[in-house]
Amino acid sequence: MIRKFILISVFALFLQTQLVSAGTEGSEELKKSGSKDTAEECFEGFSRAMFKVNHTLDKAIFKPVAKGYRALPAPIRRGTGNATDNLRSLLTIPNNLLQGEFGRAGNTVARFGINTSVGILGIFDPATQLGFEDQGKEDFGQTLGVWGADSGCYFVLPILGPTTARDAVGMVGNMLLDPVYHITHNSEIQNGFVGNDNYSEHNYFYYQGTGAVDFRAKNIESFDSLEENSIDLYASLKSLYLQNRKQKILNSKSTVETQD
Protein backbone atom coordinates (compact mmCIF):
# COMPACT_ATOMS: atom_id res chain seq x y z
CA MET A 1 0.00 0.00 0.00
CA ILE A 2 2.84 2.38 0.88
CA ARG A 3 4.62 1.52 -2.35
CA LYS A 4 1.47 2.25 -4.32
CA PHE A 5 1.07 5.62 -2.61
CA ILE A 6 4.67 6.53 -3.40
CA LEU A 7 4.21 5.61 -7.06
CA ILE A 8 1.05 7.69 -7.31
CA SER A 9 2.79 10.59 -5.59
CA VAL A 10 5.75 10.50 -7.95
CA PHE A 11 3.49 10.47 -10.98
CA ALA A 12 1.23 13.22 -9.70
CA LEU A 13 4.02 15.57 -8.67
CA PHE A 14 5.62 15.26 -12.06
CA LEU A 15 2.29 15.70 -13.75
CA GLN A 16 1.66 19.05 -12.14
CA THR A 17 4.78 20.46 -13.81
CA GLN A 18 3.00 20.19 -17.14
CA LEU A 19 1.47 23.57 -16.38
CA VAL A 20 4.37 25.15 -18.24
CA SER A 21 2.93 23.83 -21.50
CA ALA A 22 0.16 26.40 -21.49
CA GLY A 23 0.61 29.16 -24.05
CA THR A 24 -1.37 32.26 -24.92
CA GLU A 25 -2.66 31.02 -28.27
CA GLY A 26 -6.39 30.50 -28.36
CA SER A 27 -7.32 33.54 -26.25
CA GLU A 28 -9.08 35.19 -29.19
CA GLU A 29 -10.82 31.91 -29.95
CA LEU A 30 -12.06 31.79 -26.38
CA LYS A 31 -13.49 35.28 -26.71
CA LYS A 32 -15.22 34.41 -29.97
CA SER A 33 -16.68 31.25 -28.45
CA GLY A 34 -18.48 33.32 -25.84
CA SER A 35 -17.43 30.90 -23.12
CA LYS A 36 -18.40 32.13 -19.66
CA ASP A 37 -16.84 29.21 -17.86
CA THR A 38 -14.68 30.56 -15.05
CA ALA A 39 -13.13 28.70 -12.15
CA GLU A 40 -13.61 30.16 -8.69
CA GLU A 41 -10.82 30.28 -6.12
CA CYS A 42 -12.51 28.35 -3.32
CA PHE A 43 -9.69 27.60 -0.87
CA GLU A 44 -6.90 30.05 -1.67
CA GLY A 45 -5.11 29.83 1.67
CA PHE A 46 -5.02 26.05 1.56
CA SER A 47 -4.12 26.02 -2.14
CA ARG A 48 -1.19 28.41 -1.70
CA ALA A 49 0.15 26.32 1.17
CA MET A 50 -0.09 23.13 -0.88
CA PHE A 51 1.51 24.88 -3.85
CA LYS A 52 4.54 25.77 -1.72
CA VAL A 53 4.88 22.17 -0.54
CA ASN A 54 4.61 20.76 -4.06
CA HIS A 55 6.96 23.37 -5.50
CA THR A 56 9.56 22.64 -2.83
CA LEU A 57 9.41 18.92 -3.59
CA ASP A 58 9.75 19.63 -7.30
CA LYS A 59 12.89 21.71 -6.79
CA ALA A 60 14.42 19.26 -4.32
CA ILE A 61 13.63 15.97 -6.05
CA PHE A 62 11.89 16.03 -9.39
CA LYS A 63 13.79 18.74 -11.22
CA PRO A 64 17.13 17.04 -10.42
CA VAL A 65 15.70 13.73 -11.65
CA ALA A 66 14.56 15.42 -14.87
CA LYS A 67 18.04 16.86 -15.34
CA GLY A 68 19.52 13.41 -14.87
CA TYR A 69 17.11 12.01 -17.44
CA ARG A 70 18.18 14.71 -19.89
CA ALA A 71 21.73 13.37 -19.69
CA LEU A 72 20.56 10.29 -21.62
CA PRO A 73 21.22 10.29 -25.38
CA ALA A 74 18.61 12.23 -27.35
CA PRO A 75 17.44 9.19 -29.39
CA ILE A 76 16.64 7.30 -26.18
CA ARG A 77 14.68 10.22 -24.77
CA ARG A 78 12.87 10.76 -28.04
CA GLY A 79 11.91 7.10 -28.26
CA THR A 80 10.73 7.07 -24.66
CA GLY A 81 8.56 10.12 -25.22
CA ASN A 82 7.12 8.62 -28.41
CA ALA A 83 6.30 5.32 -26.69
CA THR A 84 4.47 6.93 -23.76
CA ASP A 85 2.59 9.26 -26.11
CA ASN A 86 1.56 6.24 -28.16
CA LEU A 87 0.05 4.52 -25.11
CA ARG A 88 -1.63 7.78 -24.15
CA SER A 89 -3.54 7.55 -27.44
CA LEU A 90 -5.60 4.71 -25.96
CA LEU A 91 -7.19 7.22 -23.59
CA THR A 92 -7.58 9.83 -26.33
CA ILE A 93 -9.61 7.55 -28.62
CA PRO A 94 -12.65 7.00 -26.34
CA ASN A 95 -12.67 10.67 -25.40
CA ASN A 96 -12.60 11.65 -29.08
CA LEU A 97 -15.66 9.47 -29.59
CA LEU A 98 -17.48 10.84 -26.53
CA GLN A 99 -16.85 14.36 -27.82
CA GLY A 100 -18.23 13.49 -31.26
CA GLU A 101 -14.81 14.01 -32.87
CA PHE A 102 -15.01 10.96 -35.09
CA GLY A 103 -12.44 12.18 -37.59
CA ARG A 104 -9.93 12.78 -34.83
CA ALA A 105 -10.72 9.37 -33.36
CA GLY A 106 -10.02 7.71 -36.71
CA ASN A 107 -6.75 9.60 -37.05
CA THR A 108 -5.68 8.56 -33.55
CA VAL A 109 -6.57 4.91 -34.20
CA ALA A 110 -4.50 5.01 -37.40
CA ARG A 111 -1.57 6.62 -35.60
CA PHE A 112 -1.68 4.05 -32.82
CA GLY A 113 -1.85 1.12 -35.24
CA ILE A 114 0.98 2.37 -37.44
CA ASN A 115 3.28 3.46 -34.64
CA THR A 116 2.68 0.32 -32.57
CA SER A 117 3.50 -1.98 -35.50
CA VAL A 118 5.82 -0.21 -37.93
CA GLY A 119 7.09 2.13 -35.23
CA ILE A 120 8.06 -0.76 -32.91
CA LEU A 121 5.68 -0.28 -29.99
CA GLY A 122 5.58 3.46 -30.55
CA ILE A 123 9.30 4.12 -30.18
CA PHE A 124 9.27 5.69 -33.64
CA ASP A 125 6.61 7.88 -35.26
CA PRO A 126 6.19 6.81 -38.91
CA ALA A 127 2.50 7.79 -38.76
CA THR A 128 3.37 11.48 -38.96
CA GLN A 129 5.46 10.89 -42.07
CA LEU A 130 2.50 9.06 -43.61
CA GLY A 131 0.22 12.05 -43.05
CA PHE A 132 -1.42 11.06 -39.76
CA GLU A 133 -0.29 13.97 -37.61
CA ASP A 134 -0.79 14.13 -33.87
CA GLN A 135 -3.97 16.14 -33.30
CA GLY A 136 -3.56 16.39 -29.55
CA LYS A 137 -4.36 14.30 -26.50
CA GLU A 138 -7.79 14.16 -24.85
CA ASP A 139 -8.93 13.27 -21.35
CA PHE A 140 -12.28 12.95 -19.60
CA GLY A 141 -11.96 16.38 -17.99
CA GLN A 142 -11.88 17.86 -21.49
CA THR A 143 -14.84 15.71 -22.47
CA LEU A 144 -16.86 17.08 -19.55
CA GLY A 145 -15.94 20.58 -20.70
CA VAL A 146 -17.11 19.84 -24.24
CA TRP A 147 -20.38 18.58 -22.78
CA GLY A 148 -20.84 21.93 -21.06
CA ALA A 149 -19.77 21.21 -17.49
CA ASP A 150 -18.36 24.27 -15.72
CA SER A 151 -14.89 24.17 -14.19
CA GLY A 152 -16.21 24.70 -10.68
CA CYS A 153 -13.73 25.42 -7.90
CA TYR A 154 -10.03 25.76 -8.57
CA PHE A 155 -7.78 24.35 -5.88
CA VAL A 156 -4.36 22.81 -5.34
CA LEU A 157 -4.12 19.37 -3.78
CA PRO A 158 -1.15 18.01 -1.86
CA ILE A 159 0.83 15.75 -4.18
CA LEU A 160 -1.79 15.90 -6.97
CA GLY A 161 -1.27 19.61 -7.61
CA PRO A 162 -3.65 22.06 -9.34
CA THR A 163 -7.07 21.00 -10.53
CA THR A 164 -10.69 22.03 -10.72
CA ALA A 165 -13.82 20.26 -9.57
CA ARG A 166 -14.47 19.20 -13.17
CA ASP A 167 -10.94 17.90 -13.72
CA ALA A 168 -10.99 16.05 -10.40
CA VAL A 169 -14.02 14.12 -11.64
CA GLY A 170 -12.16 13.71 -14.92
CA MET A 171 -9.30 11.92 -13.16
CA VAL A 172 -11.71 9.18 -12.11
CA GLY A 173 -13.15 9.01 -15.62
CA ASN A 174 -9.66 8.66 -17.06
CA MET A 175 -9.05 5.48 -15.07
CA LEU A 176 -12.39 4.04 -16.18
CA LEU A 177 -11.70 4.79 -19.86
CA ASP A 178 -7.99 4.00 -20.09
CA PRO A 179 -7.31 0.48 -21.45
CA VAL A 180 -3.75 0.61 -20.08
CA TYR A 181 -5.15 1.05 -16.57
CA HIS A 182 -7.45 -1.96 -16.94
CA ILE A 183 -4.76 -4.18 -18.48
CA THR A 184 -2.39 -3.49 -15.59
CA HIS A 185 -5.08 -3.91 -12.93
CA ASN A 186 -6.95 -6.99 -14.19
CA SER A 187 -5.21 -10.38 -14.33
CA GLU A 188 -7.94 -11.90 -16.54
CA ILE A 189 -7.43 -9.19 -19.16
CA GLN A 190 -3.67 -9.69 -18.92
CA ASN A 191 -4.01 -13.42 -19.62
CA GLY A 192 -6.24 -12.81 -22.61
CA PHE A 193 -4.45 -9.78 -24.01
CA VAL A 194 -0.77 -10.33 -23.34
CA GLY A 195 -0.73 -14.03 -22.48
CA ASN A 196 0.44 -13.70 -18.89
CA ASP A 197 -0.34 -12.00 -15.61
CA ASN A 198 3.12 -10.64 -14.86
CA TYR A 199 1.90 -7.08 -15.15
CA SER A 200 0.78 -5.33 -11.98
CA GLU A 201 -0.95 -2.11 -11.10
CA HIS A 202 2.49 -0.62 -10.52
CA ASN A 203 3.22 -0.80 -14.26
CA TYR A 204 0.50 1.75 -14.89
CA PHE A 205 2.20 4.28 -12.64
CA TYR A 206 5.64 3.46 -14.05
CA TYR A 207 4.31 4.27 -17.52
CA GLN A 208 2.64 7.47 -16.37
CA GLY A 209 5.66 8.54 -14.37
CA THR A 210 8.03 7.93 -17.28
CA GLY A 211 5.98 10.14 -19.54
CA ALA A 212 5.86 12.86 -16.91
CA VAL A 213 9.64 12.74 -16.36
CA ASP A 214 10.15 13.06 -20.10
CA PHE A 215 7.87 16.09 -20.22
CA ARG A 216 9.53 17.72 -17.20
CA ALA A 217 12.95 17.29 -18.78
CA LYS A 218 11.79 18.94 -22.00
CA ASN A 219 10.45 21.97 -20.16
CA ILE A 220 13.05 22.78 -17.51
CA GLU A 221 13.93 26.12 -19.12
CA SER A 222 10.28 27.04 -19.68
CA PHE A 223 9.43 26.59 -16.03
CA ASP A 224 12.60 28.37 -14.86
CA SER A 225 11.81 31.34 -17.10
CA LEU A 226 8.26 31.53 -15.81
CA GLU A 227 9.48 31.42 -12.22
CA GLU A 228 12.07 34.14 -12.80
CA ASN A 229 9.62 36.49 -14.51
CA SER A 230 6.56 36.00 -12.30
CA ILE A 231 5.75 38.36 -9.45
CA ASP A 232 3.30 35.79 -8.08
CA LEU A 233 4.18 32.31 -9.35
CA TYR A 234 1.05 30.78 -7.83
CA ALA A 235 -1.21 33.22 -9.68
CA SER A 236 0.74 32.82 -12.92
CA LEU A 237 0.50 29.04 -12.86
CA LYS A 238 -3.17 29.16 -11.96
CA SER A 239 -3.86 31.41 -14.96
CA LEU A 240 -1.82 29.20 -17.29
CA TYR A 241 -3.45 26.02 -16.03
CA LEU A 242 -6.99 27.32 -16.56
CA GLN A 243 -6.14 28.84 -19.94
CA ASN A 244 -4.47 25.64 -21.07
CA ARG A 245 -7.50 23.57 -20.11
CA LYS A 246 -9.79 25.89 -22.07
CA GLN A 247 -7.51 25.70 -25.09
CA LYS A 248 -7.56 21.92 -24.98
CA ILE A 249 -11.34 21.81 -24.74
CA LEU A 250 -11.50 24.03 -27.84
CA ASN A 251 -8.80 21.94 -29.56
CA SER A 252 -6.70 25.06 -30.09
CA LYS A 253 -2.93 24.80 -30.15
CA SER A 254 -0.72 25.67 -27.19
CA THR A 255 3.00 26.23 -27.29
CA VAL A 256 5.32 23.76 -25.61
CA GLU A 257 9.04 24.43 -25.44
CA THR A 258 11.07 21.28 -25.84
CA GLN A 259 14.70 20.32 -26.01
CA ASP A 260 16.14 17.07 -27.34
Positions of PLM-derived features:
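Bacterial N-terminal signal peptides that target proteins for export
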Residues: 1-7
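Bacterial N-terminal signal peptides
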Residues: 8-16
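Sec/Tat signal peptide C-region and signal peptidase I cleavage site
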Residues: 18-22
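A structured, mid-to-C-terminal "fold-capping" secondary-structure block
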Residues: 23, 30-35, 147-260
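Cationic, glycine-rich low-complexity segments
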Residues: 38, 42-71
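Alpha-helical scaffold segments that form or flank carboxylate-/histidine-based iron centers
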Residues: 45-46, 75-82, 105-115
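Membrane interface segments of multi-pass transport proteins and intramembrane proteases
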Residues: 60-78, 130, 141
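Mid-length scaffold segments of soluble, non-membrane domains
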Residues: 86-165
